[in-house]
Amino acid sequence: DFFVWTSVPSCPYKKIFYNWETNKAEKCVFCYPRLENGLPQICAETCVGRMRYVGVVFYDMDKVEAMAATKNEQDIYENTLDLILDPHDPEVIKAARAEGISEAWIKAAQKSPVYKLVKEWGVALPLHPEYRTLPMVWYVPPLSPILQRVTSDVYLPDAHEMRVPVQYLANLFTAGNTEILARTLQRVLDMREYMRRRETGDGPIDHNVELTEDQMYGMYKLLALSKYNDRFVIPSDVKVSREGRLEMQHNRGFACPTGGCQ
């Protein structure tokens, strides 16, 4: 895995512990000291491709056990989406406030790029959902080069005409469900075709698409033109005001007895 062999060894926040078999092991801890202070992981912030997004997602804890107990592993992805709650829903906002979730976290969830990619547009998928671990690291499957036999007469190919087989990607992201994987790829292809027609003035797309024009343009802006604050929407975990936190850091250092400077 490229991430394991490059990002983790060079990461200053990784966890190193002794392993009796390999003599050493390095684990990603998701840069929790940075996240708790409203900062993204160092690998996400320094990513040259600017293709990593970090945000808040609300989900229903009461449904987790039922999701994990799903008999057909190809249904786990759809059941996982059912766990994710709409942060704009008044009932969800009311329940979040009742649970003591701050307004900063609610606003962060409403602006979350992760919610848009995962639930609103449905173009991000979990890695190996059949393990039933409820992963919250999601991936937009890649659009690989098209096959040689269709390059001469096709500008944008169908999802099944990519060089990387749909079944291979489905085994990674949807527990082998090729229908969901092909649908996800087609949404990204539709966005690309929409933007091409928008720039060239060729008119609307001549086939049925699942997303609206506003959704496809919003996807284009997030994936291609997003700024730092659009890609990383992370509320601070500190319970005190910024002024109060700085005052405690000045008087006591970062290890505050009250826990306010964590």
Protein language model regions, located:
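Iron-sulfur cluster-binding cysteine motifs and their immediate structural context
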Residues: 1-23, 30, 36-60
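Long, compositionally biased charged/polar accessory segments in the mid-to-C-terminal portions
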Residues: 49-262
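Catalytic cores of enzyme domains
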Residues: 24-30, 120, 127
